[in-house]
Swiss-Prot record:
<dbReference type="GO" id="GO:0043165">
    <property type="term" value="P:Gram-negative-bacterium-type cell outer membrane assembly"/>
</dbReference>
<dbReference type="InterPro" id="IPR052037">
    <property type="entry name" value="LPS_export_LptA"/>
</dbReference>
<dbReference type="GO" id="GO:0001530">
    <property type="term" value="F:lipopolysaccharide binding"/>
</dbReference>
<dbReference type="GO" id="GO:0015920">
    <property type="term" value="P:lipopolysaccharide transport"/>
</dbReference>
<comment type="function">
    <text>Involved in the assembly of lipopolysaccharide (LPS). Required for the translocation of LPS from the inner membrane to the outer membrane. May form a bridge between the inner membrane and the outer membrane, via interactions with LptC and LptD, thereby facilitating LPS transfer across the periplasm.</text>
</comment>
<feature type="region of interest" description="Disordered">
    <location>
        <begin position="166"/>
        <end position="185"/>
    </location>
</feature>
<protein>
    <recommendedName>
        <fullName>Lipopolysaccharide export system protein LptA</fullName>
    </recommendedName>
</protein>
<dbReference type="GO" id="GO:0009279">
    <property type="term" value="C:cell outer membrane"/>
</dbReference>
<comment type="subunit">
    <text>Component of the lipopolysaccharide transport and assembly complex. Can form head-to-tail homodimers and oligomers. Interacts with LptC, LptD and with the lipid A domain of LPS.</text>
</comment>
<dbReference type="Pfam" id="PF03968">
    <property type="entry name" value="LptD_N"/>
</dbReference>
<comment type="similarity">
    <text>Belongs to the LptA family.</text>
</comment>
<keyword id="KW-0813">Transport</keyword>
<dbReference type="GO" id="GO:1990351">
    <property type="term" value="C:transporter complex"/>
</dbReference>
<feature type="signal peptide">
    <location>
        <begin position="1"/>
        <end position="27"/>
    </location>
</feature>
<keyword id="KW-0574">Periplasm</keyword>
<keyword id="KW-0732">Signal</keyword>
<dbReference type="InterPro" id="IPR014340">
    <property type="entry name" value="LptA"/>
</dbReference>
Length: 185
C-alpha cells in the first residue's frame, strides 16, 4: 500500500516539475529518478474512492523539488492508473526546483491542480512563478505540458503582471554560442 501511495505522490511531484518548466528552463535532469519523500501531520486513504489525502504541513521532496502545502489530495478516478488528479492547497501552497542551468524556479498559489491524463496544470488564487528576477503573476496560470503553452489570467478589474529581466533573455538566446559568436551578434 505504501508503494501505491508513493506512486500517486510521484504524480504530484511530476506536476510541480512540469509546472516549473513553464518558465523557459529545463529541470534538473535526474529529479524524477530520485526517491519521493512525503511528510505530513496526517495521512488517510479511501481505497474504494481511490483517494489519498495528506494534511497538516505537507512536505513533498524529490531531488531538488520541494512542495509545501496545507493539504494534498490525490484522486485516481475509476482506479485507472495514468488518470490521476492531484490537488494541493495552502496559504499559499509553494514549490521550489533547481534547474540544470543552476537557476531556481519558485512558485506559489492557493491551489495547485494537475490532471495527469491531459498533462494540464492550473495554479489558482494569487498564482505566481519566478525564475531569478523574472516572474509572472495573476489569479490563474494554466499550462499544457506537452504543448508547452502557458496562459495567465486575472479576475475582473485586475491585470496579469510579468517582469522579464533582459540579461536572462539574452542568456537563453545566446545558449551554446562561444564568446566570439556572442560579440559578433
Amino acid at each position: 500500500m505504501k508503494f501505491k501511495t508513493n506512486k500517486l505522490s510521484l504524480n504530484l511531484v511530476l506536476a510541480s516539475s512540469l509546472l516549473a518548466a513553464s518558465i523557459p528552463a529545463f529541470a534538473v535532469t535526474g529529479d524524477t529518478d530520485q526517491p519521493i519523500h512525503i511528510e505530513s501531520d496526517q495521512q488517510s486513504l479511501d481505497m474504494q474512492g481511490n483517494v489519498v489525502t495528506f494534511t497538516g504541513n505537507v512536505i513533498v521532496t524529490q531531488g531538488t523539488i520541494k512542495i509545501n502545502a496545507d493539504k494534498v489530495v490525490v484522486t485516481r478516478p475509476g482506479g485507472e492508473q495514468g488518470k490521476e488528479v492531484i490537488d494541493g492547497y495552502g496559504k499559499p501552497a509553494t514549490f521550489y526546483q533547481m534547474q540544470d542551468n543552476g537557476k531556481p524556479v519558485e512558485g506559489h498559489a492557493s491551489q495547485m491542480h494537475y490532471e495527469l491524463a491531459k498533462d494540464f496544470v492550473v495554479l489558482t488564487g494569487n498564482a505566481y512563478l519566478q525564475q531569478v528576477d523574472s516572474n509572472i503573476k495573476g489569479d490563474k496560470i494554466t499550462y499544457l505540458v506537452k504543448e508547452q503553452k502557458m496562459q495567465a489570467f486575472s479576475d475582473k478589474g485586475k491585470r496579469v503582471t510579468t517582469v522579464l529581466v533582459p540579461s536572462q533573455l539574452q542568456d537563453k538566446n545566446n545558449k551554446g554560442q562561444t564568446p566570439a559568436q556572442k560579440k559578433g551578434n
